[in-house]
Curated annotation (Swiss-Prot):
Record EC number: 2.7.7.-, 2.7.7.108
Cofactors required: Mg(2+); Mn(2+)
Species this protein is from: Rhodopseudomonas palustris (strain HaA2)
Disulphide-bonded residues: none
Name the UniProt record assigns to this protein: Protein nucleotidyltransferase YdiU
Catalytic activity: L-seryl-[protein] + ATP = 3-O-(5'-adenylyl)-L-seryl-[protein] + diphosphate; L-threonyl-[protein] + ATP = 3-O-(5'-adenylyl)-L-threonyl-[protein] + diphosphate; L-tyrosyl-[protein] + ATP = O-(5'-adenylyl)-L-tyrosyl-[protein] + diphosphate; L-histidyl-[protein] + UTP = N(tele)-(5'-uridylyl)-L-histidyl-[protein] + diphosphate
Gene coding for it: ydiU
Catalytic residue list: 250 (proton acceptor)
Amino acid sequence: MTVHFPFDNSYAALPENFFARVAPTPVAAPRLIKLNRPLAQRLGLDPDRLDSPEGAEILAGTRVPEGAASIAMAYAGHQFGNFVPQLGDGRAILLGEVIDRDGVRRDIQLKGSGRTPFSRMGDGRAALGPVLREYIVSEAMAALGVPTTRSLAAVLTGERVLRDPIQPGAVLTRIASSHIRVGTFQFFASRGDRDAVRALADHVIARHYPEAAEADSPYLALLEGVIARQADLIARWMMIGFIHGVMNTDNTSIAGETIDYGPCAYMDTFDPKTVFSSIDHMGRYAFGNQPPIALWNLTRLAECLVPLLSDDDDKGVEIAQRALGGFADRFNAAYLAGLAAKLGLATTQPEDTQLAQDFLAAMAKGRADFTLAFRRLSDAAIDPVDLGAVRALFDDPTAFDEWAPRWRSRISLEEQNNTARQTEMREVNPIYIPRNHRVEAVIRAAVDHDDFAPFEEILAVLSNPFREQAKFARYAEPPQLHERVLETFCGT
């Protein structure tokens, strides 16, 4: 039974300095622990054939399917503000691209598939814990409606990897609209290779921004398109309390997807200064810093594109600055529209921005749980007089008590009835997110006891994040004091 991949590879047709051709390193005993069957079907793959010994070998990198590109992509990047001229796929190999059933080109990448020319001192492998974390969180993000890479499969390798502590090895099959990053442009721009920057820009326009090809200035339209997608993406993160944790330029997707989950986490108690990543000592990538950091990253992209925007560098800089100036308006519009929907506001009033900001301020002052505060407000929309369940979430409800009558007054101006409002609010305010302590418990069960039942259960719960599931009520609960996760780790 042959596993067929309908590859249609475009990135591997670019010049050889865009990547290194390298085969995955075979593993001792591949064991498929999870296959995303609906995603496989969407990609035009046969899930029954993938769910086989041959399929496990392919998904572990032991067998390379016919037609695979098998390349490690080159890129650079600013890591915590410091430029590194060469990073690249140090433990990931792009098998190739397929056209999915929606007509969209998708990358199929093996993460943890062995050393590449970009591995530096790394072993090229991935540990089971980070693989499960990325599988859980990326699929949860998709269910939440956030643009994201996806997880097709997780495979145990039968080998151990040297981490602290030693862990079982695993490989994640990651699906993305592409793995092109801001850092990919930086790789060539930092070397003064304008021809490569132009070739990459042309490839990105054809693949992700075809409308830019028809614009008077295609490269400006490309920059504006990336800015718009990133602004919208970060606004979506802010609606669900998501903290990426490592927003380096090499982790900023040109396609506008969330990528490289590493030390990501979700906020419990609302605090804009929240940081979980063990390596983010200065809070550079704290929850509230994510919008300005996104703009900082986009500015690095704009610097790469300046020579394409005008033959005159000064004029090119001016054009780029004007484009970057649009980020704030785009982000603020998406952010405020998202907050309005979360508060049940279908129309717009001048005081809405202040109303939303004051609710967040009340949550911060009262140390309320971010996700549950919005969800309980949704539940209360059927009877706005009774906000007791919301109030109970606040350690100090003083600011909330001052805010609540203003919200009641504001929604009274809406034409919607309470039932319709509640329905719409519940569609944007999830009851289930990948709570850090729940994800950690799942990882511990798998790593310490080879027990994947909790992994399957959390995936099932998170696949319906907006629908209350009585038997899984515990997944909605914030952590008890002894359950709190204070730090997350990138796993490399």
